């Protein structure tokens, strides 16, 4: 498991460049030892520095998606059959995921992740789960909205196969999480309907001209 913590200062990233000061926290059982030949060895224990590379690769694209400055290249992090879900939408496939995030600048004057910390749980190279505990900012019709969320990314072969955004860190309502299964199914249908309408309005995930 690796932990990455960072704060995204205001006005430091754009559609073309990203500058983030990253801080990596090492577990306490990380130690250095010297063998008989006097050479230093790292006993990594549960910490493998290579595991941080997945967050290093993904986070710039995630920041672009939530920052309303995504390009078609930012969606290369998803597998072809990937899904995205938050309390408002349920997207299936990269085209629908594009529509979901391309719609942000249509709804908000400004949107971005202002602070985040990352934890990775890899069961094998490229396969596992990444948790992004974050704070998001939106400006809607002149009103400032600040929100905490937990972004859960599930990876297979280094690609995101499932992307969930838990607002207020609460599980998304569905037939499994709702106390009344019927209400959970109704919530699922509502999110799918919202996604379909957004997909049509965003011209079925068409990439914007640069």
Located regions from the model:
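C-terminal and inter-domain tail/linker signature
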Residues: 2-210
């Amino acid at each position: 498991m690796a932990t990455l913590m960072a704060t995204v200062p205001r006005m430091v990233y754009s559609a073309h460049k990203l500058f983030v000061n990253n801080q990596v926290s090492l577990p306490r059982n990380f130690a250095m030892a010297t063998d008989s030949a006097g050479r230093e060895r790292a006993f990594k224990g549960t910490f493998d520095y290579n595991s941080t590379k997945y967050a290093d690769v993904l986070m710039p694209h995630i920041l672009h998606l939530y920052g309303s400055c995504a390009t078609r290249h930012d969606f290369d992090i998803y597998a072809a059959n990937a899904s995205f879900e938050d309390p408002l939408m349920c997207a299936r496939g990269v085209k629908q995921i594009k529509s979901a995030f391309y719609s942000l600048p249509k709804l908000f004057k400004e949107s971005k992740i202002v602070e985040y910390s990352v934890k990775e749980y890899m069961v094998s190279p490229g396969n596992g789960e990444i948790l992004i505990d974050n704070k998001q900012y939106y400006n809607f019709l002149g009103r400032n909205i600040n929100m905490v969320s937990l972004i859960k990314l599930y990876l297979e072969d280094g690609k995101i196969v499932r992307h969930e955004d838990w607002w207020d860190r609460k599980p998304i309502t569905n037939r499994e999480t709702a106390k009344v299964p019927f209400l959970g199914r109704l919530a699922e249908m509502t999110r799918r309907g919202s996604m379909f309408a957004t997909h049509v309005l965003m011209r079925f995930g068409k990439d914007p001209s640069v």
